[in-house]
Amino acid sequence: MLRVIVLGAAAGGGVPQWNCGCPVCRAALDDPRLARTQASLAISADNAHWFLINASPDLRQQIVATPQLHPRAGALRHSPIAGVILTNGEVDAVAGLLSMREGSPFSIYAHDKVLAILRANSIFNVLNESIVPRRPIATDQPFEPLLPDGALSGLQITAFEVPGKGAWYLEGRAHPGGDSQSGDTLGLTITDKSTGQSLHVLTACARVTDDLKARLAGAPLLLFDGTVWRDDELITAGLGTKTGQAMGHIAMAGDDGAIAALADLGIGQKLFLHINNSNPALLAHSAERGQLETAGWQIPADGTEVTL
């Protein structure tokens, strides 16, 4: 069976953000049940070996909160985490790697462009490549990630290009991996080889193209970019100066938003993740939450598990 754990569902900074008093963050400060850590997933085909989709800055907290990711009883050093698949080079996708520097073996899988970012930042050298190899992945070429002992994982992963943008901290600077936008933002199709069940993960997506609709149609499970409800919400709320589009994220709502664009595709379960603190849909009793739930979408809490 294919198992998915939502380790965190929030966008960069989490909810509440450390210095924010917006309505969503204030509500989460008053009621910790509303809090969410930064977006990351754990995927397994055997319930024993797990692969992370992105390593959020909150990863240590997420591991502590997730028994499936704890060291084996009686082992001095052990982790069931077999690898990390990176979908982009943003801070909230790679910073958690620094919390995995204690010498347990696992592999990092990423596009060459993201691996170039890691090479260009010497702080990531705390991950000894003889123990934590960095394995390039190519788009539209299925691969089976390996367990630390070289055994096959039982998962098949296909990365594909998604409309998006490069890491914000590289804006206006030379990209270590070159100027091409190829590899900046990846989606993933993950399949359990024994059952054929599959899911799609898109932690960032700037727009839904016809090709993307065709790829996602009929999927049993979709985990999709839910950063903002409205494209201009950070600006209108006084929280920022960029639109969702400028950050590489499609809005949930609107004629060109994700809810409308992905309707009527026969998708089974639809979960939003990477949800920004500015997004009113995080509030359980908001009109926005009601609209997305009516359209068949869910806002997962940290720790939500789905089995296919």
UniProtKB/Swiss-Prot annotation:
<comment type="function">
    <text>May be involved in the transport of PQQ or its precursor to the periplasm, in association with PQQ biosynthesis, but is not absolutely required for this synthesis.</text>
</comment>
<dbReference type="InterPro" id="IPR036866">
    <property type="entry name" value="RibonucZ/Hydroxyglut_hydro"/>
</dbReference>
<dbReference type="InterPro" id="IPR011842">
    <property type="entry name" value="PQQ_synth_PqqB"/>
</dbReference>
<protein>
    <recommendedName>
        <fullName>Coenzyme PQQ synthesis protein B</fullName>
    </recommendedName>
</protein>
<keyword id="KW-0813">Transport</keyword>
<dbReference type="GO" id="GO:0018189">
    <property type="term" value="P:pyrroloquinoline quinone biosynthetic process"/>
</dbReference>
<dbReference type="Pfam" id="PF12706">
    <property type="entry name" value="Lactamase_B_2"/>
</dbReference>
<comment type="similarity">
    <text>Belongs to the PqqB family.</text>
</comment>
<keyword id="KW-0884">PQQ biosynthesis</keyword>
<comment type="pathway">
    <text>Cofactor biosynthesis; pyrroloquinoline quinone biosynthesis.</text>
</comment>
<dbReference type="InterPro" id="IPR001279">
    <property type="entry name" value="Metallo-B-lactamas"/>
</dbReference>
